[in-house]
Amino acid sequence: MEEVIVTSAIIGKSASEIADPIHIVSGDDISTEATQSLGETVDDLLGVSSADYGSAVGQPIIRGMSGSRVKILDNGIVNRDVSGLGADHFNDLDLGNAQQIEVVRGPSSLLYTNGTIGGIINVVDNSIAMEDVEQLVKVGGETQSVNEGNTTTFFYQDNLNNLNVSFAYKNTDLENYDVPNGAIMHEEEEHHDDEAHDEHEEEHEEHEENVGFLSNSDFASESMKFGASVVSDNGYLGFSISSSESSYGIPFHGEGHEGHGHGDEHGDEHGDEEEGHDEHEGERIFTNTDSDKFDIKGSYDLDGFNFANSVDFFYRDSDYSFTEQHAEEEHEEEEHHDEEEHHDEHEGHSEGPTTFTNDSAEAGFIFDLSNDLYSQKVSFNLVNEDTAIFGSEAFMNPASREEFTVGYYLSRSFNGFDLDLGVRYDTIDNSGSVTSAHEEEHHDEDEDHHDEDEHHDEDEH
């Protein structure tokens, strides 16, 4: 039987030699599973779970920590999306061509990025080949009955005149997934008069909804990636271009609009429980994402130099946008057309989209200083990142961030013990604007005055 050696791209050791808390999920295990989120892919591992928010969103949790405490890496480089800014924001990574997924905890995680108290998850593919490849063609298809979903994949790689090229494509279309009748329960607030209130002993009553499917649980995405590299005795050099678009619903997000903090006020204004429920019954909450990345990556053997064995280097330019929007079905819009101005009176009930953008450029070097006694690496990173939020639910002003970091990792085994040490120094410069409380109050007064003018005009008519 042929021996298969799995090596960590982070530490550079085989799985049997690694003393760090690390899990490696192979590409074969990923490809045999149904299309699912990153969190669901790794939640069977020890100490790892997933915070699911529909079929598209599954944020990994490592040792009880998630969000900004767990960093997601794409081929050793931080995936700079906006998944850390909301529970319903998904990790924008394509697992269709993943060679392996590494879950790393411990000192070695500090070598690649800051804020990794929980750990890192590194998704590795072979788009920029580090060794010469042979011709390989893969065509795949998947059908899911629970959501009438279909997924098609295509992968091609070859060595053309000493140039390694690869192309990967994936298209996924999943509809709302089926649930047993009566599986979805709602808690409705009592808005009846005292006579109706006396008929019920509890403030809330539960009722079953025979819908047969979970609304806003759909997911659709399309991604492609092209890479090329040249390999020599001294190392390799290559580049890759990737693009992905996705759209997915956010289930249970809009019931009574409780998650937006104005459901009670809106319900009280209507006064009738049934009417308030029907108003949001056909609401559609969905998200669109768009991501483009350009990578340059390579490695050079420094044999003959006394200070280092080799140096790995990379550069990435990425543009990412995430748009969340509320909408109502056509019949609902017609039914409430006359109440359109009335809805605008309630602060925060705007149906306009909210867009998150993140544009970043990152460069780094990792020097291998290992010898026969110990393994050690030193990294240098430079990041320039611009983040902005626009729209009806924007909660921060545009901001720019510049980082310069130095990381150090040391590992040594002696007398049956393993010593691992990680050190990281960060210089971070944040710039942006601050909206004062006085400006916010003045803005609210202007909105209230504008609403009063609209009411006055309505009374005249």
Language-model segments: residues:
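Short, acidic, small-residue-rich periplasmic hinge/interaction motif at the N-terminus
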Residues: 1-31, 67
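Short acidic/polar hinge/loop motifs at secondary-structure boundaries
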Residues: 78-105
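Extracytoplasmic beta-strand/coil segments of soluble accessory domains associated
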Residues: 39-78
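Outer-membrane beta-barrel translocator/receptor signature
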Residues: 96-100, 105, 110-185, 218-222, ...
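Signature of Gram-negative outer-membrane beta-barrel scaffolds
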Residues: 374-461
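Flexible loop and strand-edge segments within Gram-negative outer membrane beta-barrel domains
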Residues: 215-217, 221, 235-311, 317-332, ...
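Transmembrane beta-barrel strands of outer-membrane/channel proteins
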Residues: 139-143, 158, 167-173, 230, ...
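Transmembrane beta-barrel wall of Gram-negative outer-membrane proteins
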Residues: 145-173, 185-251, 286-303, 370-374, ...
